[in-house]
């Protein structure tokens, strides 16, 4: 409810002194703090927007770097197919392509790098040292980032095929048999059963996590589907 100040004829709320006293008004003006509150709101909003833009810019830079690197790695892979070995995609690189990975049903084509260290994974999926070479007998384990090259793993289904092109040009065909979430300490992911021809793709989980890393991994297992092409 509101009344009208009898002295200055400005509206006032019951129990609140007149905020716009006219000359001669007996009411005492109440301090106006609305501008301070508005300034705080604007400042917080601007800061939030700045943080969001910085995060978006960083994410865009990571995405651009990841896919630009794949274009350079593709050139190195062509030289590898021509008979060269350990062809670095750029002079200062400490890795090189060891396979080409394709998932026809998803339109995915990626070049796999030697090693699964963080520096390598920034540019492409990486083959884990100590496991079978991609396309060879045993269990070949390949890791990749959930928000760039291996983001597609969240959509693949059992029965889809994965093709691995080797440096010789031969292609091994695998069929996805299993998807599961494990703890990152689960070494069974790299186990190689006798007479196995397995491809294991690993990335961080969950896919929508705000921070990289974490204790969980998403594992896609594929078994050889037939004779290499």
PLM segments and residue spans:
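Serine/threonine-rich, low-complexity intrinsically disordered segments
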Residues: 4-5, 30
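Cysteine-cluster motifs in flexible loop/terminal segments that predominantly coordinate metals
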Residues: 5-25
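Residues immediately within or flanking Cys/His clusters that coordinate Zn2+
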Residues: 2, 15, 198
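Solvent-exposed, non-transmembrane regions of membrane-associated and secreted proteins
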Residues: 39-229
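Juxtamembrane low-complexity tails/linkers enriched in Ser/Thr-Pro and polybasic
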Residues: 23-33
């Amino acid at each position: 409810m509101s009344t009208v100040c009898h002295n200055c004829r400005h509206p006032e709320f019951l129990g609140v002194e007149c905020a716009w006293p006219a000359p001669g008004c007996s009411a005492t003006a109440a301090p106006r703090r609305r501008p301070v509150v508005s300034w705080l709101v604007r400042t917080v909003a601007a800061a939030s927007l700045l943080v969001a833009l910085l995060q978006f810019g960083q994410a865009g830079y990571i995405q651009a770097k990841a896919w630009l690197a794949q274009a350079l790695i593709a050139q190195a892979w062509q030289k590898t197919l021509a008979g060269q070995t350990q062809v670095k995609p750029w002079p200062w690189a400490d890795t090189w392509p060891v396979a080409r990975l394709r998932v026809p049903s998803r339109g995915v084509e990626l070049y796999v790098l030697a090693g699964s260290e963080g520096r390598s994974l920034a540019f492409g999926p990486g083959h884990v040292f100590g496991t079978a070479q991609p396309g060879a007998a045993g269990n070949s384990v390949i890791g990749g980032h959930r928000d760039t090259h291996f983001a597609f793993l969240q959509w693949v289904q059992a029965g889809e095929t994965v093709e691995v092109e080797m440096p010789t040009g031969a292609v091994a065909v695998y069929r996805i048999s299993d998807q599961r979430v494990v703890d990152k300490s689960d070494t069974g992911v790299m186990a190689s059963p006798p007479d196995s021809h397995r491809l294991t793709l690993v990335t961080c989980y969950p896919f929508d996590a705000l921070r990289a890393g974490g204790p969980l991994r998403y594992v896609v297992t594929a078994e050889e589907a037939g004779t290499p092409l």
